[in-house]
Swiss-Prot record:
HAMAP family hit by this protein: Leu_tRNA_synth_B
Localization (cell): Cytoplasm
UniProt KW keywords: Aminoacyl-tRNA synthetase, ATP-binding, Cytoplasm, Ligase, Nucleotide-binding, Protein biosynthesis
Organism: Thioalkalivibrio sulfidiphilus (strain HL-EbGR7)
Positions occupied by motif 'KMSKS' region: 576-580
Lineage, top ranks: Bacteria, Pseudomonadati, Pseudomonadota, Gammaproteobacteria, Chromatiales
Gene Ontology process terms (BP): leucyl-tRNA aminoacylation
Record-given protein name: Leucine--tRNA ligase
GO molecular function: aminoacyl-tRNA deacylase activity; ATP binding; leucine-tRNA ligase activity
One GO cellular component term: cytosol
Length: 817
C-alpha cells in the first residue's frame, strides 16, 4: 500500500470500477425493496456551483446508505433544459440556444461524474429533447379535451421594444430589464390549467406529508389560501352589478366606498367621458403589480363618479378606481371598510373618505383610536341596524343568511390560489400543441402528429420569438376541418417540464406512452432533495401534475414525494454565493487540488443539511487533513501484516473499551445518517473515533484484531460520504469485493455492555472529576471512590462534608461548607 494519500488517481480508479461494473444501474428485478432517491435536477447553465455540489452530495450519501441497507436504489440525473438564460446567452454569444444548452449539458455531466455521484446515467434525460416533451404535449391535449386546460385573456407585462412578455422579476423600476423600455400592461390570450379544481385536494394532501418540513407545508397552505366568506353584489344603476368577496361580512355596515381594479370593465366605461380618469388608468397600466408589490405600493385612486347601492341599507356608495385592487385576484372589485381594514383606512385618509366604526372590541376597556389606525380585530357589532350587539362570529352567519334570503349574496369558500397560466411568449420552450383555426378555434394537435418539434437551428436576436417569423413552422391545416390554420407559437412555462420529470426517469425509454408499469414500481419518490426556494411553485405544480397523471391512470397514489429535505444555501462571507457578488468558489479547482472526497466531506461536515453552510477554506483544509490521517492510519496498520481473527472472549479491558467506543459510534452514525440525516454529527462521531484509534497503541494479536474491525467499520461508515477513498482502503485492508457492495455494518449489542460506568463528580454543583466505578457498585463504594479522587480532595480540603447526593449511573455531588 502506498504511504501517501493521492486522491486524483484513486478517485479515477474507483469511478472506472463503478462504470465497468455498472454499479449504479437500477433494475426493476434486482433484489431488495425499491428506494427512489432524487435531487432536483439542474438548469444547464454551464458550470456546477457549490449549491449543486451540496444538493447532490446529500442525495448521494442517502442513496449509498440505503444501498448498504439492502434497498434496490434508483438515483437518476437529468437537465431542466428550457428557459430564458439560454435565450440571453444566444444574444450575448451569437449561438442558437440549443447549441449552447447541449454543450453545457456535456460539460456539466463530466463535472458530476468527477464528483463520483452514483447516478444511473442510462436514465439521463433533457427536457428540451422532443422524445421527452412530446409526452407533456400529449397530456396537455388530454387536459384540453377534459376542460382542465383553457384559453382566456390575461394581463401581462409587455416589452414594446423586445416584443415579448416579461415575468414580474424581469421588470425593474417599471422598465424592461434588457431593453430599458417602459413596460406596458397588456391583455393577451393565454392558456391556463385549472389547478383550482384541485385546490381542496392539494390542501388536504399536505396533512399526510409527514416526511416534509413543516415550513414547506405551511408555505403551501398559505399559497393555496383557503378562506370562508361571503360573495355579495352591489347594484350599480345602469351597469352590471359589482361582485365582491369578503371574509368579514360582519363589517358590511361600515362600507364607505367600493374599489375596482384599473382594468375592470366598469372603470373603462367610466373613463370613456373622463380624460383625467382615462389618464390615471393608463398610468396604472405601466405600474408593475404583483401581490408582493402591493404592500409597499403608494395607494392611489380616483372617483369614477358612479355610485353602487349598499345591499343592506340601500345607501349610495362611491365607486373608486384603486391601484391596489388586482383584476387577476377575485372579482377585481373590493368592498372597502376603512375603520376595520388597514389598507382601506390608508386610502380613505388620503382621499378624505368616511371612516365608519361598526365593530367594538369584545373586551371592555380596550381603546380604539381610528385617527391612528384601523381596528382590525373581531368584536361586537354597533351602528349595524338589526345586527347590533352580535359578535363577529354570530354576525357572519346572520348577515350571510340575510343576503342569501334577499338573493344578494351567498356563502363561499375561496382560494388565494389562481389557475396556472402556462403560456410563455418565448422561443426556447416546449411548443404548445394547439392549431388555431379561423373556423374551428383552437384545436389540439392529434396524437399521431406529436411531438410538435421546436426548430433548433434558428437565428436568435432577442426581438420576439424566431418561430413567429417562420411560415414553415406556423402554416398548417386544421385537423378538424382541413382548412388553412396556424400553429400556436407560444411555449410552455418551464415549470411544466419539471412538474413530471421525476416520473419519466422511471421509464425514460417508454416509447408508446408517457409512463409505463415501471412508474408504479418506483413511485412515489422516497426521498426528494432541493432548495427551500422551490417550496411553493415547483413542489405545488409537481403535486398537481401527479394528480393529473393519476386521473389519467398513469400513476398510483396521490403524492409524488414521500420525504422532502430542503438543504440550506452555501454562503461566503455571510452572503449567498453569486457571480455578481464575486464570492463564488469553483468546485473544479477544489477537486483538482484536494480531490472529490474532500469537497464532499466538507460539504457534509460544515453544517446540518437544512441550515445554510458558511464556506471556509480552513474547513476544506481540515477535511483534507482528516482523509490523509485516515489513509495513514490504515497504511500503518496494514504494514504490520494480516490481523488475526477477533476473539471477543479474549479481550482485555482496553480492547473492550475500544470495541465499545466503535459500536457506540456505529449506533450513532447509523441513526444520524439513516433517521436524522444529520451527516455533520455522523462525521464528527467518526472523527472522535479516529482520535481514539490514534491513541490505541496495542500491537498484540487481539489488539490488532480490534483495530482491523475498527478500521473496516470506519471505512464502511464513511463510504457513503467519501466513497473513493473507502473503495481503495477496503481492498487495502484485505477485504474481498468492493466497499460499495458491502452491507451496512451491524452494531454488536454485547460490545456496548460495560462492567464499569463513568460518573461525574461535583463539589457544590461544580464539575471537579470523572470517575470509573463497577456497574454494580454499592452507594458506599461510589461515595468512597468520589472522595478519593485527587482533584475532589483539593476542593474539599479544610471543609466539612455536609451530605453526598448520588444519582446512579450519572453523578455524585459532594456538598461541603
Amino acid at each position: 500500500m502506498q504511504e501517501h494519500y493521492e486522491p486524483d488517481a484513486l478517485e479515477r480508479q474507483a469511478q472506472t470500477w463503478w462504470d465497468e461494473h455498472q454499479t449504479f444501474r437500477a433494475r426493476e428485478d434486482a433484489p431488495g425493496e425499491p428506494f427512489y432517491c432524487l435531487s432536483m435536477f439542474p438548469y444547464p447553465s454551464g458550470r456546477l456551483h457549490m449549491g449543486h455540489v451540496r444538493n447532490y452530495t446529500i442525495g448521494d450519501v442517502i442513496s449509498r446508505y440505503q444501498r448498504m441497507q439492502g434497498r434496490n436504489v434508483l438515483q437518476p440525473m437529468g437537465w431542466d433544459a428550457f428557459g430564458l438564460p439560454a435565450e440571453n446567452a444566444a444574444i450575448k454569444h451569437l449561438v442558437p440556444p440549443a447549441k449552447w444548452t447541449y454543450e453545457n449539458i456535456a460539460y456539466m455531466r463530466g463535472q458530476l461524474q468527477r464528483l463520483g455521484f452514483g447516478y444511473d446515467w442510462d436514465r439521463e434525460l433533457a427536457t428540451c429533447r422532443p422524445e421527452y416533451y412530446r409526452w407533456e404535449q400529449w397530456l396537455f391535449t388530454r387536459l384540453v379535451k377534459k376542460g382542465l386546460a383553457y384559453k382566456k385573456t390575461a394581463m401581462v407585462n409587455w416589452d414594446p421594444v423586445d416584443q415579448t412578455v416579461l415575468a414580474n422579476e424581469q421588470v425593474i423600476d417599471g422598465k424592461g430589464w434588457r431593453s430599458g423600455a417602459p413596460v406596458e400592461r397588456r391583455e393577451i390570450p393565454q392558456w391556463f390549467l385549472r389547478i383550482t379544481d384541485y385546490a381542496e385536494e392539494l390542501l388536504k394532501g399536505l396533512d399526510g406529508l409527514e416526511g416534509w418540513p413543516e415550513q414547506v407545508r405551511t408555505m403551501q397552505r398559505n399559497w393555496i389560501g383557503r378562506s370562508e366568506g361571503v360573495e355579495l353584489e352591489f347594484e350599480v344603476p345602469g351597469e352590471a352589478p359589482l361582485t365582491v368577496y369578503t371574509t368579514r361580512p360582519d363589517t358590511l355596515m361600515g362600507v364607505s366606498y367600493v374599489g375596482v381594479a384599473p382594468e375592470h370593465p366598469l372603470a373603462a366605461r367610466a373613463a370613456e367621458g373622463d380624460g383625467k380618469l382615462a389618464a390615471f388608468i393608463e398610468a396604472c397600466r405601466h405600474t408593475k403589480v404583483s401581490e408582493a408589490d402591493m404592500a409597499t405600493l403608494e395607494k392611489k385612486g380616483m372617483d369614477t363618479g358612479l355610485k353602487a347601492v349598499h345591499p343592506v341599507t340601500g345607501e349610495p356608495v362611491p365607486v373608486w378606481v384603486a391601484n391596489f385592487v388586482l383584476m387577476e385576484y377575485g372579482t377585481g372589485a373590493v368592498m372597502a371598510v376603512p375603520a376595520h381594514d388597514q389598507r382601506d383606512w390608508e386610502f380613505a385618509r388620503q382621499y378624505g373618505l368616511p371612516v365608519r366604526q361598526v365593530i367594538l372590541p369584545a373586551e371592555e376597556g380596550v381603546a380604539v383610536d381610528l385617527d391612528q389606525a384601523a381596528f382590525t380585530d373581531k368584536g361586537v357589532l354597533i351602528e349595524s341596524a338589526q345586527f347590533n350587539g352580535l359578535s363577529s362570529a354570530q354576525a357572519f352567519d346572520a348577515i350571510a343568511d340575510f343576503l342569501e334570503k334577499q338573493h344578494k349574496g351567498r356563502r363561499r369558500v375561496n382560494y388565494r390560489l389562481r389557475d396556472w397560466g402556462v403560456s410563455r411568449q418565448r422561443y426556447w420552450g416546449c411548443p404548445i400543441p394547439i392549431i388555431n383555426c379561423p373556423d374551428c378555434g383552437p384545436v389540439p394537435v392529434p396524437e399521431e402528429q406529436l411531438p410538435v418539434v421546436l426548430p433548433e437551428d434558428v437565428a436568435f436576436d432577442g426581438v420576439g420569438s424566431p418561430i413567429k417569423r417562420m411560415p414553415e413552422f406556423i402554416d398548417t391545416t386544421c385537423p378538424e376541418c382541413g382548412g388553412k390554420a396556424e400553429r400556436e407559437t407560444d411555449t410552455f412555462d418551464t415549470f411544466f417540464e419539471s412538474s413530471w420529470y421525476y416520473a419519466r426517469y422511471t421509464c425514460k425509454d417508454a416509447d408508446g406512452a408517457m409512463l409505463d408499469e415501471r412508474a408504479r414500481h418506483w413511485l412515489p419518490v422516497d426521498q426528494y432533495i432541493g432548495g427551500i426556494e422551490h417550496a411553493v411553485l415547483h413542489l405545488l405544480y409537481a403535486r398537481f401534475f401527479h394528480k393529473l397523471m393519476r386521473d389519467e391512470g398513469l400513476v398510483d397514489g396521490d403524492e409524488p414525494f414521500t420525504r422532502l429535505l430542503t438543504q440550506g444555501m452555501v454562503l461566503k462571507d455571510g452572503a449567498k454565493m453569486s457571480k455578481s457578488k464575486g464570492n463564488t468558489v469553483d468546485p473544479e479547482a477544489l477537486i483538482e487540488r484536494y480531490g472529490a472526497d474532500t469537497v464532499r466531506l466538507f460539504m457534509m461536515f460544515a453544517a446540518p443539511p437544512e441550515l445554510s453552510l458558511e464556506w471556509s477554506d480552513s474547513g476544506v483544509e481540515g477535511a483534507y487533513r482528516f482523509l490523509k490521517r485516515l489513509w495513514k492510519q490504515v497504511h500503518d496498520h496494514v504494514q504490520g501484516g494480516a490481523a488475526p481473527a477477533l476473539d471477543k472472549a479474549a479481550l482485555n479491558a482496553d480492547q473492550q473499551a475500544l470495541r465499545r467506543k466503535l459500536h457506540q459510534t456505529l449506533a450513532k452514525v447509523s441513526d444520524d445518517i439513516g433517521r436524522r440525516t444529520t451527516f455533520n454529527t455522523a462525521i464528527a462521531a467518526c472523527m472522535e473515533l479516529m482520535n481514539e484509534l490514534g491513541r490505541f497503541e496495542d500491537k498484540s494479536g487481539q489488539g490488532r484484531a480490534v483495530m482491523q474491525e475498527a478500521l473496516e467499520t470506519t471505512v464502511l461508515m464513511l463510504s457513503p460520504i467519501v466513497p473513493h477513498i473507502a473503495h481503495a482502503l477496503w481492498s487495502e485492508l484485505g477485504r474481498e469485493g468492493a466497499a460499495v457492495d458491502q452491507p451496512w455494518p451491524v452494531v454488536d449489542e454485547s460490545a456496548l455492555e460495560s462492567d464499569t460506568v463513568e460518573l461525574v463528580v461535583q463539589v457544590n454543583g461544580k464539575l471537579r472529576a470523572q470517575i470509573q466505578v463497577p456497574a454494580a457498585a454499592a452507594r458506599a463504594a461510589i461515595e468512597e471512590a468520589a472522595l478519593a479522587d485527587e482533584n475532589v480532595q483539593r476542593h474539599i480540603e479544610g471543609k466539612t462534608v455536609v451530605k453526598m447526593v448520588v444519582v446512579p449511573g450519572r453523578l455524585v455531588n459532594v456538598v461541603v461548607k
